[in-house]
């Protein structure tokens, strides 16, 4: 789980620096519409992988979805900590 926090910091830096030849920077340059398109695509791929009962494919696709959700959170100025706090409120 610690890696997700590290990834959040990496994504924030990519958004700030917008390096050339960076897929993540390209997402940020494309704005929220491009990011949302990728989130939607990845969510669909998760559904298909789960429907196919393919654990390896599902692991890969969930990782892609989590990555793109984190990009969306950074774009929207939200942190993983805020999401964790919301989940904690709901389930404690």
UniProtKB/Swiss-Prot annotation:
<dbReference type="Pfam" id="PF01503">
    <property type="entry name" value="PRA-PH"/>
</dbReference>
<dbReference type="InterPro" id="IPR021130">
    <property type="entry name" value="PRib-ATP_PPHydrolase-like"/>
</dbReference>
<dbReference type="InterPro" id="IPR008179">
    <property type="entry name" value="HisE"/>
</dbReference>
<comment type="similarity">
    <text>Belongs to the PRA-PH family.</text>
</comment>
<keyword id="KW-0547">Nucleotide-binding</keyword>
<dbReference type="GO" id="GO:0004636">
    <property type="term" value="F:phosphoribosyl-ATP diphosphatase activity"/>
</dbReference>
<keyword id="KW-0368">Histidine biosynthesis</keyword>
<keyword id="KW-0378">Hydrolase</keyword>
<dbReference type="GO" id="GO:0000105">
    <property type="term" value="P:L-histidine biosynthetic process"/>
</dbReference>
<keyword id="KW-0067">ATP-binding</keyword>
<protein>
    <recommendedName>
        <fullName>Phosphoribosyl-ATP pyrophosphatase</fullName>
        <ecNumber>3.6.1.31</ecNumber>
    </recommendedName>
</protein>
<keyword id="KW-0963">Cytoplasm</keyword>
<comment type="pathway">
    <text>Amino-acid biosynthesis; L-histidine biosynthesis; L-histidine from 5-phospho-alpha-D-ribose 1-diphosphate: step 2/9.</text>
</comment>
<keyword id="KW-0028">Amino-acid biosynthesis</keyword>
<dbReference type="GO" id="GO:0005737">
    <property type="term" value="C:cytoplasm"/>
</dbReference>
<dbReference type="GO" id="GO:0005524">
    <property type="term" value="F:ATP binding"/>
</dbReference>
């Amino acid at each position: 789980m610690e890696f997700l926090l590290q990834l959040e910091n990496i994504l924030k830096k990519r958004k700030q620096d917008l390096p050339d030849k960076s897929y993540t920077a390209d997402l940020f340059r494309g704005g929220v519409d491009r990011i949302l398109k990728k989130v939607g695509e990845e969510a669909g791929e998760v559904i298909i992988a789960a429907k196919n009962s393919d654990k390896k494919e599902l692991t890969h696709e969930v990782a892609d979805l989590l990555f793109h959700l984190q990009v969306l959170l950074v774009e929207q100025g939200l942190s993983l900590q805020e999401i964790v706090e919301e989940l904690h409120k709901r389930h404690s």
